[in-house]
Structures are given as C-alpha cells and as structure tokens.
Amino acid sequence: MRVLGLFVLCVAASLQAAVSGDSQIRAKAGPSEIVITTTSRLAGAIHSLTWNGREFIDSADHGRQLQSASNFDVGSKFIPETFNPTEAGSRIDGVGPNSTSVLHALTAKGNVLSTENQMAFWLQPDEKSFGNSAKNTTALSNHLLKKRVTIGVHGLPHAIGYDVTFTVPKREHHRYAQFEAVTGYMPPAFSKFWTYDLTKKKLLSLSDGPGEQSLPVIFSTMDRQHAMGVWSPGQPSKGFEQAGYGRFRFEAEKVVKWNCVFREAHPTGVAAQDYSYRCYVLVGSLKNVTDTINALHQRSPPIDKDKN
C-alpha cells in the first residue's frame, strides 16, 4: 500500500507541475486586432494568427505552425530532419492531441507571449526521412527554446517582435547548426510571393523557388489585402550571405511556407551555448507590411554578428 501511495503522490505531483499551453494574446492593428493563439497540443507553439477576418496559419500535424526548429549535422554529413529538434512536436504526433515536446513555462498577458520549451526530435530514433535514418537516439531532445512574441513592437501595430533563444546542450558534437528562428505555414490563398529590397525600397515579385535568398520574403493574397512577411536585422548569417529567407510552395499538401534561418559552422565544433535571434513578423495588408519593414529598418540598430 505504501508503494501505491507513493505512486499516486508522484502522479499527482506530475499533473500539478504540467504547464498549460493554451493561451491567447492580442493587440489592435488598423481595422482589426492581431490575435495569436497557442495550444497545449503543440506544447505552446503558435496554432493560429488572425487579422481582419482571415486566418494566416495553416496548422496541421505538429510541423505546420508558426514555430521554431533547428537542424544539426552530429559531426557527419548534414542531412535535413535527421537531427531536428522541433518546438511543436514530432512527426509521429501527427494530428493527435498530444506533443512529444515538453512545455516548461508559458506566460501570456495583453500583447506579449513568453514560452520555454524542450523540443522533441522530428523523427523517432527508428524513423527515416526521405530514406535517411534518424541520428537521434531519443524522442525528446535536450535542446531548449525560449521565445518572446510581442504584437505591436516599437509603436508599430503591424510588427510582431519574435525573439528566440536556442540552447544547444553539452555532450553533443556538431560542426554545423541551422536555426530556423521562425517559420510560418500559411493557407494556399496566400499565393503571391514577394521580396522586398530595403535599399531601393522596392517590392518585387518572387518565384516559387523553392529555396533561400538574402532579401526578406512576403506572402500575400492576390488582392493584396492580407499579407505576412518576415525580416531580421541579424540577416544574413556570417559566411552565408546569399541565404536567410526561404519560401516554399507545397502543391500536394495545399500549404505555403516561409522561414528565417540562421547558420553556425565551425570546423572544431559548434559551441554548447545559447544562440539568440530577433525577427519581425509583419501582418496586415501588403502595404502595411512594406511600410512596417521600412520603419523597422530605419530604427533597428545593426546586429554584431560576432556576438551571440
């Protein structure tokens, strides 16, 4: 009976310690509020972002959200997804109600959201991605992600500050690290891809790619009334000057994706430490987005890329 009692106490303590991932923040932006919603199902990752009557996120499985992830080479040839800590959870979590990722902390008040998450590996130890075996030996990684999301930063209502810190643990060896600071999976109605030249202040049509470039990307509806883009004062990464902003169209899955990616490469090994990045996610009409990028660019100080 004593053993049973201890078991019940342990279970109760575990349940008491569980952190809810259900939250919502909001703030006025033009004719509407920007509303951001997280869920426990996704371990605090962003499930929904709405503005002016439209959903901007095509949330499905545990990969298609507004979220963060990382990829590493484990000291061998770099193969995407084979060592891939992911905020929202694992591929095996699918469309189910739970996440392999563990949410350690969440606060949401007014227009500010903060979370701390222990990321799951995208693949299970015995799984493969495009024929390539997982390099991780556990389902849950020791990689931590902290994020702070603020709607309406710097007095700009259409700008969402997206600050992330990836903690790379000790006792791992990597020569190459790829940090997807933020990615957005969007409904196919955001079918028009754009890039924005900040120097010339010029909006340019962008091909489907897929791939990355050094200029920020924006997706919009055909009527330009709804758009989402991303820009970071820290781009591009040192040594990767032609990359940083990706765009992808997945016809079969009926989803489009953009991302903001940073890279670290060191022949003797990527240091076990915190890696922090600041991005801005822009939401509104296409004009709102380009006007906001211009305003941010004018007031954001340059990032020292030798410090992290």
Roles of regions detected by a PLM:
Residues 18-32, 37-39, 224-308:
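Beta-strand-rich recognition/accessory modules
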Residues 50, 156-199:
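Acidic (Asp/Glu-rich), glycine- and aromatic
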Residues 17-103, 278-286, 290-302:
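Beta-strand-rich N-terminal accessory domains
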Residues 74-157, 171:
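Extended, loop-rich substrate-binding clefts of extracytoplasmic carbohydrate-active enzymes
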Residues 24-29, 36-37, 46-48, 111-118, ...:
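Generic recognition of long tandem-repeat/solenoid scaffolds
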Residues 5-14:
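Bacterial N-terminal signal peptides
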Residues 181-184, 189-251:
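Active-site/ligand-binding surface loops and adjacent short beta/alpha elements
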